């Protein structure tokens, strides 16, 4: 995975933030009565789903000695999300036009042909067909 950029925290000029007195610090290891009885639980970190790990794996297959910045990874992730959304929307419209409630590989293939230009669409369709064939043969 790509290394994360170091986050800078805003400086408070050596002073405690407004509304918090220095005496309010909690000791580590001691639980409050509410936490011990199970009334309130801390929320865990919300997970952000990205294509970063997959983009990184493809990069290493193509150019093993090349890295990628966090900003570039973010841009590529946005790009993949955008294309995915366009293809899904178009496939949904095609299914609705044909009065079908299920999006099949045929709708995906047609939407890719409509969205992507020329040679790019041909390559995408051939790679998609290859992936579906590989999946179908391994599932049996």
Swiss-Prot record:
Low complexity: bias regions: 11-21
InterPro entries: Histone-fold, Histone_H2A/H2B/H3, Histone_H2B, HISTONE_H2B_site
Family designation: Belongs to the histone H2B family.
Cross-link (Glycyl lysine isopeptide (Lys-Gly) (interchain with G-Cter in ubiquitin)): 134
GO CC, alphabetical: nucleosome; nucleus
UniProt-listed Pfam families: Histone
Name of this chain's protein: Histone H2B
